[in-house]
């Protein structure tokens, strides 16, 4: 099995990249793909860049050039579920855009024309992530992750997202685009992110302070999932 792993930022991929054995680097457009083996599993690790376009472009190149069997999106997210704190984990059951609106034509909020209302994560990958959560004794929430080309900071945008998507667990800037591309390629995916900030009016302050914690926690989860895959 080959596993595609996607992180947007240098801080979100560096721990994994540095542990890849026989690492080779492929530079495509604005992204970088690092291939090799990690914990006995063949991996292709993409540093996509921030935002939906960069994520979609990078995911397309990753799937086309490396042909992974499954994709794990790692990194940080802003927590909206009431039980989430910095360093906790959010696992996607589905992903949606929070900044897409073609409701005038009968679509649901967040639904792109011609697409499903949400992109569903793979049930087997969700179950694997949840087993790793139990083994690592981490706090986690499984639920909806919403993506958009904005860092959510302030009461008004936060209220809009919660009003439109009352079941939302976390927000970030790439997962829905990654899920969209994986859906088109019929590639199973899951999003496993660590909380870097609890979305509120001071999110930008806590994000800068706690990004390192989130990167360490999300890396811990990805490595646990790879070890579990290697033992199957």
Swiss-Prot record:
GO terms for biological process: L-methionine salvage from methylthioadenosine; L-methionine salvage from S-adenosylmethionine; purine deoxyribonucleoside catabolic process. The keyword Hydrolase applies. The keyword Hydrolase applies. Its EC number is 3.2.2.9. Substrate binds at residues 78, 152, 173-174. It catalyses: S-adenosyl-L-homocysteine + H2O = S-(5-deoxy-D-ribos-5-yl)-L-homocysteine + adenine; S-methyl-5'-thioadenosine + H2O = 5-(methylsulfanyl)-D-ribose + adenine; 5'-deoxyadenosine + H2O = 5-deoxy-D-ribose + adenine. Keywords: Amino-acid biosynthesis, Hydrolase, Methionine biosynthesis. One of its GO terms (cellular component) is cytosol. InterPro entries: MTA_SAH_Nsdase, Nucleoside_phosphorylase_d, Nucleoside_phosphorylase_sf. Pathway: Amino-acid biosynthesis; L-methionine biosynthesis via salvage pathway; S-methyl-5-thio-alpha-D-ribose 1-phosphate from S-methyl-5'-thioadenosine (hydrolase route): step 1/2. GO terms for molecular function: adenosylhomocysteine nucleosidase activity; methylthioadenosine nucleosidase activity. The active site is at 12 (proton acceptor), 197 (proton donor). Catalyzes the irreversible cleavage of the glycosidic bond in both 5'-methylthioadenosine (MTA) and S-adenosylhomocysteine (SAH/AdoHcy) to adenine and the corresponding thioribose, 5'-methylthioribose and S-ribosylhomocysteine, respectively. Also cleaves 5'-deoxyadenosine, a toxic by-product of radical S-adenosylmethionine (SAM) enzymes, into 5-deoxyribose and adenine. Thus, is required for in vivo function of the radical SAM enzymes biotin synthase and lipoic acid synthase, that are inhibited by 5'-deoxyadenosine accumulation. Homodimer. Belongs to the PNP/UDP phosphorylase family. MtnN subfamily. This is 5'-methylthioadenosine/S-adenosylhomocysteine nucleosidase. It comes from Edwardsiella ictaluri (strain 93-146). The gene is mtnN.
């Amino acid at each position: 099995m080959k596993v595609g792993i996607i992180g947007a930022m240098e801080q979100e991929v560096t721990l994994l990249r540095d542990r890849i054995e026989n690492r080779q680097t492929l530079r495509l457009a604005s992204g970088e793909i690092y291939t090799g083996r990690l914990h006995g599993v063949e991996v292709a690790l993409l540093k996509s860049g921030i935002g939906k376009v960069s994520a979609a472009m990078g995911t397309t190149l990753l799937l086309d050039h490396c042909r992974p069997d499954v994709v794990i999106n790692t990194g940080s997210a802003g927590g909206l579920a009431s039980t989430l704190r910095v360093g906790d984990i959010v696992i996607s059951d589905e992903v949606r855009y929070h900044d897409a609106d073609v409701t005038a034509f009968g679509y649901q909020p967040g639904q792109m024309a011609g697409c499903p209302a949400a992109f569903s994560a793979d049930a087997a990958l969700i179950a694997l992530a949840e087993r790793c959560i139990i083994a690592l004794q981490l706090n986690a929430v499984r639920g909806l992750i919403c993506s958009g080309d904005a860092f959510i900071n302030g009461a008004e945008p936060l209220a809009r997202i919660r009003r439109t998507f009352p079941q939302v667990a976390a927000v970030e800037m790439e997962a829905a685009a990654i899920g969209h591309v994986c859906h088109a390629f019929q590639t199973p995916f899951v999003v496993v992110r660590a909380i870097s900030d609890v979305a509120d009016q001071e999110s930008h302050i806590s994000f800068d302070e706690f990004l390192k914690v989130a990167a360490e926690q999300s890396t811990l989860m990805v490595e646990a999932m790879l070890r579990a895959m290697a033992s199957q």
